[in-house]
Curated annotation (Swiss-Prot):
Signal peptide (UniProt feature, chain positions): 1-19
Organism annotation: Caenorhabditis briggsae
Presence of the UniProt keyword Glycoprotein in the record: yes
Keyword set, alphabetical order: Glycoprotein, Proteoglycan, Signal
Record's protein name: Chondroitin proteoglycan 9
Positions of glycan attachment: 25, 27
Domain of life: Eukaryota
Amino acid sequence: MNFWHLLLLAVLFFVTVFGADLEGSGSGDVVEDASEQAILKAQNLLNSVPSEESGAEVEASGEDVQTFFF
């Protein structure tokens, strides 16, 4: 490795370690709020999907399929 590779690795290391502090307040609140919002969105999506027990979808039996096609 030459000097430029080592310099690039050092810069990348410092950016990954201290980059989160530059983006947010540095306390980690921004990351926690974003993760909580993502969890709430996922829960809302799961709650909006109809379950099989709701009766919205009825599976056809073999007899229903046979009478439909023949």
